[in-house]
């Protein structure tokens, strides 16, 4: 008899997520948010097909963390050891195809919170970006652009070197720098929410003014630490200088 995992669906402030769990309950993959229940169901099927294609690559970032990237689209959890990441990657391949999908259970409280979060999102249309650009702000923190195995990433670092945000991959250096500019605008507009998943991890979710681009922050064990990370991102993102260590 096959050992089955399961897909569970959870509604959070940034949308409907699906999580792939092993048969022992271990989290193997947590998706980004989808706008609707129908969207997340389609997302599960697309993820399954991607797993069948077996286009998994394991990367190590500049902070020594390992994660799998599937089909250049799905990014796994962070792990301290390559062996851990390889084990989880094998489990995703093993469980994704035949895992049962646990239907979403309607939750009026969560649905109301999600609706309010969408309704209260700011667009930034009333912001004079030229005036913002010309406001005198002392440099603080830095964006580090790095060329890694899956492309270019940027990291937002505080003055003491603490990691505030680590981006997805970009195909070119130019697109990565453009990504920084978009991130800076999003942080200034300020559509931050604190996401708590079923495993009691907290992280910020930042949406761009258009709502199309989503940035996921680092994971924390308490809401307070996640809230502090939001304030740090707001503080440093606006005035951080952009550096390219690999240029020498």
Report the location of each language-model feature.
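Intrinsic disorder/low-complexity detector
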Residues: 1-15, 25, 49-64, 93-151, ...
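C2H2-type zinc-finger recognition helix
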Residues: 37, 82, 173, 223-227
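Amphipathic alpha-helical interaction modules
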Residues: 39-55, 184-188
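Structured core of small recognition/catalytic domains
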Residues: 174, 188-191, 231-248
